[in-house]
């Protein structure tokens, strides 16, 4: 297939339309559940009060802002797929973000251009300015329901990555919820991410936690432990996408159960060693260390719990200092070849007498 045929094929897979609507119309559609913001997407509303104030100020001053994107569901409703920060800001200011009471009822800060906005709420704003916000047009790009799912996913991913966008795990959390077994597999991920032992050995910031890093780390282990032989993608995040999509469509419950059991056993074993177990150079949490330790233990043919804590910690330190391991833990260390090389080294050092 040549380049023109390829482009023509994919252009046919996505069907779109556009319309200009006022924010008042968008607010009313949201109240009537005609525009839907999924809970998985809404949780990523993270603009602070100043950013929200800046956007309201921009509307009042007539400063242009980007379009929002919606996808048409089978029942005709629209699902917001880009523009969460802007739409949620307007909903919050008008007191309509009722599913998120902590972030609802925005009170503005001082604007960069209009400092008099400080302390203004929907109850105190002059009527003419309130109507200015409600009547301001917003370009809505509509992805029709007969667009191919893969293209809807690709669009969502591209629109929501970078800047104030979502992490890849947050995107997975949103986009795959339409699959029949999404709730089953996502509950597995959530339960493992909240394993108390896991939380003790993986120490991440509140911001990283909010961006679902615990969930992604479990998905990382699950994918590499159970399906490492199917890792052919150039980018490891695409591999995680593939595995999560497969398990949300047709979960392999036997593999899921055995992998979850392994995960829980490893977390319990590592807990006394603390979160520094995954440290490498300046990184408090190195994915090279995470992969090497978890995968070495999960693929061990012997009872790793018989290795006492201090012995294992000393072996981990030896792994950190191993020149060959450090070479493979550098750039491009998440490609399939590098992961396999690191695992061979890790098993030799951590398990001593076991080979890959």
Summary of predicted features, one role per range:
Residues 207-211, 253, 283-286, 336:
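Conserved phosphate/pyrophosphate-binding and hydrolysis machinery centered on Walker-type P-loop NTPases
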Residues 183-184, 243-251, 318-326:
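Eukaryote-specific, cytoplasm-facing alpha-helical/coiled-coil scaffolding segments in long proteins
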Residues 3-20, 24-25, 38-237, 310-317, ...:
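Basic- and aromatic-enriched surface patches that contact anionic nucleotides/nucleic acids
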Residues 96, 224-228, 246-249, 269, ...:
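Amphipathic alpha-helical interaction surfaces
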Residues 317-356:
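Eukaryote-biased recognition of C-terminal alpha-helical segments
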Residues 274-324:
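C-terminal hydrophobic structural anchor segments
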Residues 234-282, 289:
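Small-residue-rich helix-loop
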């Amino acid at each position: 297939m040549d380049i023109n045929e390829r482009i023509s094929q994919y252009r046919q897979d996505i069907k779109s339309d556009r319309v200009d609507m006022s924010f008042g119309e968008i607010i009313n559609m949201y109240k009537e559940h005609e525009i839907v913001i999924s809970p998985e997407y809404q949780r990523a509303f993270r603009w602070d009060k100043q950013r929200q104030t800046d956007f309201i100020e921009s509307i009042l001053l007539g400063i242009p802002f980007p379009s929002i994107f919606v996808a048409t569901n089978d029942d005709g409703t629209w699902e917001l797929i880009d523009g969460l920060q802007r739409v949620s800001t307007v909903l919050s200011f008008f007191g309509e973000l009722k599913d998120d009471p902590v972030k609802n009822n925005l009170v503005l800060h001082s604007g960069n251009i209009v400092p008099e906005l400080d302390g203004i709420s929907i109850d105190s704003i002059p009527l003419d300015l309130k109507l200015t916000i409600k009547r301001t047009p917003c370009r809505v790009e509509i992805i029709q329901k007969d667009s191919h799912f893969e293209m809807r996913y690709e669009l969502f991913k591209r629109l929501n990555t970078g800047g104030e966008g979502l992490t890849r795990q947050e995107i997975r959390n949103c986009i795959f919820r339409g699959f029949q077994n999404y709730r089953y597999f996502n509950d597995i991920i959530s339960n493992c991410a909240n394993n108390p032992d896991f939380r003790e050995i993986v120490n991440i910031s509140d911001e990283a936690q909010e961006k679902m890093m615990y969930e992604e780390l479990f998905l990382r282990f699950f994918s590499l432990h159970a399906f490492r032989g199917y890792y052919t993608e150039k980018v490891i995040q695409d591999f995680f996408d593939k595995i999560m999509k497969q398990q949300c469509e047709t979960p392999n419950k036997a593999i899921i159960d055995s992998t979850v059991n392994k995960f829980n056993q490893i977390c319990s074993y590592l807990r006394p060693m603390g979160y520094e177990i995954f440290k490498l150079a300046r990184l408090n949490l190195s994915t090279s260390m995470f992969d090497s330790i978890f995968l070495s233990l999960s693929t061990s043919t012997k009872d790793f719990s018989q290795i006492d804590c201090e012995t294992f910690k000393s072996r981990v330190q030896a792994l950190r200092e191993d020149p060959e391991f450090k070479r493979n833990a550098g750039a491009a260390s998440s490609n399939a070849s590098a992961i396999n090389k690191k695992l061979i080294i890790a098993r030799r050092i951590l398990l001593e007498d076991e080979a890959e």
